[in-house]
Amino acid sequence: AVQASARATSERLQVTNNDHWLACLPLAHVGGLSVITRSLITGTTLTVIDGFDADVVSASEATLVSLVTTALQRIDPSLFRAIVLGGARPPADRPPHCIATYGLTETGSGVVYNGKPLNSVEIEIRDGEVHVRGPMLLRCYRDGTSPLTSDGWLPTGDLGFLRDDGSLHVEGRRGDVINTGGEKVWPDDVERQLIQHPDIHDVAVTGLPDNEWGQIVAAFVVSARPNLSLDEIRAHCRAQLPGYALPKQLELVEAIPRTALGKVRRSELTV
């Protein structure tokens, strides 16, 4: 499975003997470890650094690197031939050689690059949930149990759909969707609008329980402005979002809880 993942990703990236991988993500996560396995299996040059440092990354002379979105904003992307992005959803206006990936630990790293499955990877949507099948899937967990169906498919727990051109659009984790007044709101959609506000440095959106609406859209915001108001952020989003998706609660916080790969820990967004 590890070899299949390394070969499929290397083929999509058109890796050659002249390439040089840089590993700067935590090696305890599949996003970091997979850089090591790709280099070992393809024989490319490898540099490993202890954590992300913008200056060290920029001076590495590597051609390939795997990053999270927040790290991308701190370097000059043109220094690399290709940048593989994981973790939080990357910006839509990223440079063309910055590749948005989709995958899980169970898939051995990304199996969908810029919406297109890697060779030997199959994608199906069953009841709105993304299912993946391919030779890079895990055999089982350490306790011997397997998440795979009898015919080899992995239910990912992510909801999404296939576009007309066959590319995959992932909406988010099944448990992340906010049900407010009978309408469904995806946190990512609201976050993409809020982060464009000039006084918002970081943001995460979640659903909080509400007696009237079932759930309300709540925005947790990092801002240097202590007087940033709910009315202001609602007005900022109003032209791009339907009324039911506008935040009904604003919480100003010092930091957004995130994983080492930049994903929001939504379970920790509480008041």
List where the protein language model places each region:
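AMP-binding/adenylate-forming catalytic core of the ANL superfamily
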Residues: G134, L159-A245, A255, G262-V264, ...
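Hydrophobic/anchoring residues in structured secondary elements
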Residues: L85, V205, E251-L252
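AMP-binding/adenylate-forming
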Residues: A1-R74, I99
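Short beta-strand-to-turn element immediately C-terminal to the catalytic PLP-Schiff-base lysine
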Residues: V111-G115, R126, R133, R163, ...
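Gly/Ser/Thr-rich phosphate-binding loop
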Residues: T63-L67, A71-P117, E122-E124
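Conserved ATP/PPi-binding loop(s) of AMP-dependent carboxylate-activating enzymes
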Residues: P117, R126-D151, S167, R173, ...
